[in-house]
Design a protein with these regions (language model features):
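Predominantly extracellular beta-rich ligand-binding scaffolds that present long acidic/polar faces
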Residues: 1-136
Length: 136
């Protein structure tokens, strides 16, 4: 049986420091021992920071790190930093489980786990229309 998180928002600063730290706006870690976690129709506008002495410190706007999950129809406009892998949407262990229909505010970084959109595209409703089209 799958577990689902939907229609959630993160508007705050989230920071995690420690060995193998993994932090996200909605979820920090979904590992292969857990049930499949479905995250949909969620967003983050807060600052997410992951730091680790051993170099992991993974950080994602929606999910810090996932191996057994499905992420769809989400967006991030918050700042994401970390000492390990960093993703505007989610750090994924497997290429075949990339998030779908997810967007992030474009800057100088590119992210394979989402689609970059400009501030104008967020403001004029383009992103909203794409998210609405992706709902069930």
């Amino acid at each position: 049986m799958d577990e689902t998180i939907e229609n959630c928002a993160s508007l705050c600063t989230v920071s995690c420091t420690g060995i193998d730290a993994r932090v996200g706006g909605i979820v920090g870690l979904v590992d292969y021992n857990s049930r499949t976690l479905i995250i949909r129709d969620c967003y983050n506008i807060g600052k997410i920071t992951g730091r680790s002495d051993n170099g992991s410190g993974d950080a994602g706007g929606i999910c810090g790190f996932y191996m057994n999950g499905k992420i769809s129809n989400c967006y991030n406009v918050g700042e994401i930093t970390g000492s390990g892998y960093v993703s505007k949407i989610a750090v994924s262990a497997y290429n075949d489980s990339r998030p779908t229909n997810c967007y992030y505010l474009s800057d100088t970084d590119t992210d394979l786990n989402g689609t970059a959109k400009t501030a104008a595209e967020f403001a004029n409703g383009d992103v909203l229309e794409e998210l609405k089209a992706g709902q069930r």
